Amino acid sequence: MKRGLDFYAPWCAPCKAIEPHLMTTAQSVGIKVEKLNVEEKRHMFDKYGVRTVPTLILMDGESETARLSGKMNLESIKSFLGG
């Protein structure tokens, strides 16, 4: 089952900007997105080797299938999630 991991920080302006696009697109393609706050889930950032926010990781089961980092827009999110 595909799922998304959204690595973000509450102070990150690009993270805030993509949230509505990410959630709407994910819902439309049937992908559940788990939001992971750098300030609360540091161990998850280390586990997945995330060094910048925002970072989106697409998972199929326990395997990473794709990663997108840095500034994003609606089109890049749709392309990434297959929407």
Question: What spans do the regions from the language model cover?
Answer:
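Short active-site neighborhood of thiol/selenol oxidoreductases, capturing the structured segment around
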Residues: 1-10
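Hydrophobic beta-strand anchors of alpha/beta hydrolase catalytic cores
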Residues: 4-5, 33, 56
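The canonical Cys-X-X-Cys-His
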Residues: 12-15, 56
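Typically the conserved alpha-helix immediately C-terminal to a functionally engaged Cys/Sec
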Residues: 14-29
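Charged, surface-exposed interaction regions in soluble eukaryotic proteins
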Residues: 31-34, 72
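Structural microenvironment flanking redox-active thiols in thiol-disulfide oxidoreductases
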Residues: 38-45
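Structural micro-motif
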Residues: 48-57
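Non-catalytic, surface beta->alpha helical segment in thiol-disulfide oxidoreductase systems
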Residues: 60-83
